[in-house]
């Protein structure tokens, strides 16, 4: 039973530990991601941030427990930190997005409904008019926006973002942040990794400082004011 006035959890990490070849990547990590919140994880390189997200997605084994308290269908959207494209494949932005929006191969054409939905998604992420651009010629920032568009339809209950602003210009970062705020207003929970402390201040409800263990966790403004988080971040990323 959740006490009155307390936002119920969507995801709970309980004593999560991960080791690889006797190296402890995460040690007894416990934290709670509240429903409808923007929860940001910060920490130095090698702190286990991406590892924790990967465990939350069920992609790697771990010790401990990760509990999900879904309100709906439990759909998860995911934008990874890195995404590689085979330059020999003539796949366009529309082809890629159509693969998950219609039940036939794209070689038979893209349905009118799928094409309209794809155009709308691309407008949302600032890629209006790039439907027929090959993925292989897109910049890293543009590829990241394509992945974000793919993660948003249908609206996920949990959106997992691993350094989503990487490779984006100032305008792209602003669009991303506006989109995160809109998603939060729609009831989507956002769990993200960021090295940009100004972005964290603008977006986060709660912050977890991770360095293989939870260093501290709490409301964003209070946590950032109480701890020298910038000292933990990679050089050049302490904005």
Annotated model-derived regions:
Residues 194-195:
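H-loop/switch region of ABC-family ATPase nucleotide-binding domains
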Residues 134-138:
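Conserved ABC ATPase signature
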Residues 200-202:
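A short, surface-exposed alpha-helical micro-motif characterized by mixed small hydrophobic
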Residues 159-163:
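Catalytic Walker B motif of ABC-type/P-loop ATPase nucleotide-binding domains
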